[in-house]
Amino acid sequence: MTLGLNITHQNKENKTGRKTIGNIVPDNWVYVQDRTVKMGRFQIYNNWSPYLVKDLSHTVWMGLEYFCNEGDRMWTMEDADFARRAIREMVTLKLIDEPSKVLDYHVERVKKAYAAYFDTYDQIDTLVKYLNTIDNLYCVGRNGQHRYNNIDHSMGTSFEAVKNILSGRTDKSNIWNVNTEQEYHESTNQENEVEVD
């Protein structure tokens, strides 16, 4: 689940030396490692693109991400209750001073947001072959390709799809080949495992 927030102030000042609009921290997303909150990650949409934010000089759009399961206690919370909880966590993390800094919010529940690599996943190539027979279907992003891609790779699949549409290219292998280079992925080799006594 994600809570999108438009806030008037962000307490985290940019001390990196990297220039940002409004001198906000330059990160796109930050993983939260604080056991006192349930938030898993927050995003700063201003840093994705300044065109996503109407008033760059005075506001920051953030997304607070929570990892939960469809139908569980968090998933079924009323939007206002979920927002209050998340905003309290922003105060706890000192991202904002007080709840009144929040101008607006939007709750988004994304079903099956993460790809699952079990059951019949070993037959994904058969599915891809079939999907590629549908001329005007371009499978992009995490859910479209059922892959655990980062946002840059997910956006890359969209860019490739647009290139194909504009050029009339019918072979979709370039779209499916985004993020298939193995050196990027975490190693699963036993030689890299650490033995613990």
Q: Residue locations for each model-derived region?
A:
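Generic macromolecular interface patches on structured domains
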Residues: 96, 100, 168-171
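FAD/FMN-dependent oxidoreductases across multiple families
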Residues: 24-26, 37-51, 98-113, 117-137
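General structural signal for secondary-structure boundaries
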Residues: 3, 78, 97, 117-121, ...
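Residue-level detector of alpha-helix boundaries and kinks
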Residues: 71-75, 112, 142-146
